[in-house]
């Protein structure tokens, strides 16, 4: 991605979602028309990317419906350019196992993000329902029954 973009002499521009393009706290639930117009103009000379701590399946339709050139998700652990994965750094199985043990010991919800879903450990806890509602986490992306030894998360 970077090589192709630099070869073309175009510097990519990165945008966050929460509090930047959208702000649910103040009622901005979609990309504002003025912002879309600015993005359209920007994309004439620079690729526009989303850069988010969210995984792609957790990015709301209001963002996905705009033709961004790429996505840097999971805080940089998964990168797409023009719909293709160009980089991913999976969390080790050992780290996943340890995180699950810590969540068990604390009685806490744990979110493990993959590209296509979010594995939720202890989804029955009230804090998950509160988090899911606040951040518009759709049920169809949540997986609660999983084998930690077989998942790839970032």
Q: Predicted segment positions?
A:
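Active-site phosphate-binding/coordination module
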Residues: 32-130
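Non-catalytic pre-domain segments flanking phosphatase-related domains
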Residues: 1-15
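Short gly/ser/thr-rich secondary-structure transition/capping motifs
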Residues: 30-31, 141
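A short, hydrophobic secondary-structure junction motif
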Residues: 18, 49-51, 147-148
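Asp-based phosphoryl-transfer active-site loop
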Residues: 11-27
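Hydrophobic, aromatic-enriched interface-forming segments
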Residues: 119, 140-154
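Flexible, charged surface loops at secondary-structure boundaries
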Residues: 6-8, 43, 104, 151-153
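Acidic, His- and aromatic-enriched active-site or binding-groove loops in soluble protein domains
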Residues: 128-146
């Amino acid at each position: 991605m970077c090589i192709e973009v630099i070869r073309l002499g175009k510097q990519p521009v990165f945008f966050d979602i929460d509090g930047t393009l959208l702000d649910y706290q103040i009622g901005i639930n979609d990309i504002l028309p003025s912002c879309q117009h600015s993005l359209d103009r920007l994309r004439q000379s620079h690729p526009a990317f989303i850069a988010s701590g969210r995984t792609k399946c957790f990015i709301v339709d209001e963002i996905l419906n705009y033709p961004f050139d790429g996505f840097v998700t999971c805080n940089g652990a998964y990168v797409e350019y023009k719909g293709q994965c160009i980089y991913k750094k999976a969390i080790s199985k050992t780290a996943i196992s340890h995180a699950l043990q810590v969540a068990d010991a604390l009685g806490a919800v744990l979110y493990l993000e993959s590209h296509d879903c979010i594995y939720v450990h202890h989804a029955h806890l009230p804090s998950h329902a509160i988090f899911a509602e606040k951040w518009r986490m759709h049920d169809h992306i949540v997986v609660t029954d999983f084998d930690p030894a077989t998942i790839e998360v970032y």
